[in-house]
A protein has these predicted regions:
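SAM/dcSAM-binding transferase cores
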Residues: 205-247
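Residue-level signal for inorganic ion chemistry
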Residues: 37, 124, 155, 213
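Mobile active-site "lid"/loop adjacent to the S-adenosyl-L-methionine
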Residues: 125-154
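General small-molecule cofactor/ligand-binding pocket signal
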Residues: 22, 100-102, 193-196
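Short glycine/threonine-rich catalytic loop with a Thr-x-Gly-x-Asp
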Residues: 28-30, 56-57, 203
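Conserved Class I SAM-dependent methyltransferase catalytic core
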Residues: 149-206
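Conserved SAM/SAH cofactor-binding pocket of Class I
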Residues: 39-134
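Class I SAM-dependent transferase core
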Residues: 2-44
Length: 247
């Protein structure tokens, strides 16, 4: 399908099942955290109805369409230009029957879905609180990185309302927010079930973490072996190469 790109847009190869992504060169491009989250969530059952909260350019949804047999994924994105870019990626990959964009704030999702109606939720939310960090970035990057339009509690409360009982939220976040996240998950009856820290090297501090939390589940947390990105020589580890479909 022919896609009309704006001057600031490019098409990148996701190097997985011939999937491609449209990216804004001046905006917020996806990183390894999204790729690892898509792999972490690939256990999502077939025929599932899935939500991607804060879909950005749609990379998580595109990858999950390739990695799972989900029935439908809805990508929620508040920024109109990012939502339009995500739609271009959907068109480019001919995924219109499986991936739909909702250009709205996640706090308005009760207008689109009934409570207890979603099989799985994924999210790579803004990592920084609204009052933290330097803000000399473009508006696009500010909204992607800082909790300006919705905070972490909004993401968790919305997930709790919309998920069916015993269905799961998959999220990637930064270690400094782990205590906040655990408190909010417990508050909204989302039980942390699986946690994996991601490190650049074996001897480095965690860079971010991947977490699965299940609605109304019993309390039992499985902490997995850390995921190491690089060997000591700076090359990717075998696990990362496998995730990137290189081996």
């Amino acid at each position: 399908m022919d896609i009309k790109l704006n001057e600031n847009e490019r098409i990148d190869d996701l190097e997985y099942k011939n999937l491609k992504i449209v990216q804004d060169k001046d905006g917020f491009c996806f990183g390894i955290d999204s790729v690892l989250l898509s792999d972490f969530a690939k256990e999502i059952r077939s025929k599932s109805i899935v939500l991607d909260l804060g879909t950005g350019n749609g990379v998580l949804g595109i990858l999950l369409c390739g990695k799972t047999k989900l029935s439908k994924i809805y990508g929620v994105e508040i920024q109109e230009d990012m939502a339009n870019i995500a739609q271009k990626s959907i068109n480019l990959n001919k995924l219109n029957d499986r991936f739909e964009i909702i250009n709205d704030n996640i706090k308005n999702l009760n207008s689109y879905f009934k409570n207890d109606s979603i099989d799985a939720i994924i999210s790579n939310p803004p990592y920084k609180k609204d009052n933290s960090g330097l803000k000399n970035e473009s508006q696009k990057k500010l909204i992607a990185r800082h909790e300006i339009t919705a905070n972490l509690e909004d993401f968790i409360s919305v997930s709790s309302k919309l998920l069916k009982s015993n269905c799961s939220l998959y999220m990637v976040h930064r270690p400094e927010r782990l205590a906040d996240l655990f408190y909010l998950l417990k508050k909204y009856k989302l039980e942390p079930k699986k946690l994996r820290l991601v490190q650049s090297f074996t001897n480095s501090k965690p860079k971010f973490f991947l977490i699965k939390a299940t609605k109304n589940a019993n309390s039992f947390l499985n902490i997995e072996q850390p995921l190491i990105i690089y060997n000591s020589d700076g090359s990717y580890t075998d696990e990362i190469l496998k995730i990137y479909n290189k081996i």
